Amino acid sequence: MKFYKYCASGNDFVITNADRKEDRSALAKELCNRYEGIGGDGFIVILPHEKYDFEWEFYNNDGSRAAMCGNGSRAAAHFAHHINKINPNMSFLTGAGIIKAKVNQDKVEVSLGKIKSVQNTFEELGKTWQLCDTGVPHLVHFCQNLDEFDTILCQKMRQKYNANVNFVKILDENHLKVRTYERGVEDETLACGTGMGACFYLAFLNKKVQNKVKITPKSGEEVGFTYKNEELFFEGKVKYCFEANYNFS
């Protein structure tokens, strides 16, 4: 199998083309293993589609399926344009709906669409939380110090609510810093696009930031978010790392 390794904002992905749908959970787990496989936060399979430029299957590091991945969608769009020679303005089908993307050399902007749902704030484990669905569910806690991030606490919240867990610090009305514990990876990752989107949207909804901000994830790779016409737009650089062939075990 020919595969391509991509990185976006600190998340890394294994991407390949396929001509039909099938359950690739075991393969995803094997490929994403950082000790015995290629290593990655996710596995993306690009499939043909009659109506849209393509359709994807997205698998988490542990082999579970995910409806959406923000950084994964940007990596997929970069791959589709630069490798599969698809038009730089494209739309593709995910489990969370249609994603629109624009590729400009190494920069990719995607629309995460309309926010699926937002729940009221609540208190748990000594912290204030809010749940926001940006294609996948995210718990968000606003804090003054990102050192509050606690993996064990995140594990408890993730298991109870079946959601990703984010800690966010507002630096000013145009800049946020975010740390995310991702389900499916079951650990903190260097970045999470849908998580950053959830943090930005809730901050904007609560009138703490402008409708256009920069966000710095743990990786330090700054990305941009904009909210306009009830849609959430996400832009940042994408890196093609390498391509190779993989022999199945």
UniProtKB/Swiss-Prot annotation:
Keyword tags: Amino-acid biosynthesis, Cytoplasm, Isomerase, Lysine biosynthesis
Site positions per UniProt: Could be important to modulate the pK values of the two catalytic cysteine residues: H138, E182
PROSITE patterns: DAP_EPIMERASE
Gene Ontology MF terms: diaminopimelate epimerase activity
Gene Ontology terms: biological process: lysine biosynthetic process via diaminopimelate
Catalytic activity: (2S,6S)-2,6-diaminopimelate = meso-2,6-diaminopimelate
EC number(s) per entry: 5.1.1.7
Cellular localization per UniProt: Cytoplasm
One cellular-component annotation, GO: cytosol
Binding site for substrate: N11, N60, G70, N71, N164, E182, R183, G193, T194
Active site: C69 (proton donor), C192 (proton acceptor)
Pathway(s) the chain acts in: Amino-acid biosynthesis; L-lysine biosynthesis via DAP pathway; DL-2,6-diaminopimelate from LL-2,6-diaminopimelate: step 1/1
InterPro entries to which the protein is assigned, alphabetical: DAP_epimerase_AS, DAP_epimerase_DapF
Matching Pfam families: DAP_epimerase
Complex and partners: Homodimer.
Biological role stated in the UniProt entry: Catalyzes the stereoinversion of LL-2,6-diaminopimelate (L,L-DAP) to meso-diaminopimelate (meso-DAP), a precursor of L-lysine and an essential component of the bacterial peptidoglycan.
Family: Belongs to the diaminopimelate epimerase family.
Name of this protein: Diaminopimelate epimerase
Native source organism of the sequence: Campylobacter jejuni (strain RM1221)
